[in-house]
């Protein structure tokens, strides 16, 4: 068996199928398991998804005390425990890097109205 076949089998076995469909512009909360020495704790990150790469890596941006902070998460890692989508936004770009230069209300995105089918 080739090493590439082995790597593909391992990657498929670790793939998490219960992830919600995340798109750029969504406001999400990501819960991450952090190990510090012998202790483990759960930390929660919330922000706007400004980029998405190959269904696996997302970049989340939020403003904290007037400073923009960006987190990059690989969604297939076992440290990412859960992802919840708070809100969808209406956008027309695949990357939202222009939000880095905006401050205040100009950095907000328009809400997308999601219809509920009965």
From Swiss-Prot:
One of the record's GO cellular component terms: chloroplast
Superkingdom of this protein's organism: Eukaryota
Major location category of this protein: plastid
GO molecular function, one term: structural constituent of ribosome
Coiled-coil boundaries: none
Family: Belongs to the bacterial ribosomal protein bL19 family.
InterPro entries in the cross-refs: Ribosomal_bL19, Ribosomal_bL19_CS, Ribosomal_bL19_sf, Translation_prot_SH3-like_sf
Alphabetical UniProt keywords: Chloroplast, Plastid, Ribonucleoprotein, Ribosomal protein
Name by which UniProt lists this protein: Large ribosomal subunit protein bL19c
Organism of this sequence: Bigelowiella natans
SUPFAM superfamilies the UniProt entry points to: Translation proteins SH3-like domain
Keyword Flavoprotein carried by entry: no
A GO BP entry: translation
Subcellular location: Plastid, Chloroplast
């Amino acid at each position: 068996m080739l090493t590439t076949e082995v790597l593909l089998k391992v990657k498929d076995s670790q793939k998490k199928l219960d992830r919600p469909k995340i798109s750029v512009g969504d406001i999400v909360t990501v819960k991450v398991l952090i190990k510090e020495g012998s202790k483990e704790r759960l930390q929660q990150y919330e922000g706007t998804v400004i980029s998405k790469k190959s269904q696996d890596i997302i970049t989340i941006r939020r403003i904290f005390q007037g400073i923009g902070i960006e987190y990059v998460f690989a969604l297939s890692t076992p440290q990412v425990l859960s992802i919840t989508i708070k809100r969808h936004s209406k956008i027309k770009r695949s990357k939202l890097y222009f939000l880095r230069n905006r401050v205040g209300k100009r950095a907000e995105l328009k809400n997308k109205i999601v219809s509920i089918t009965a």
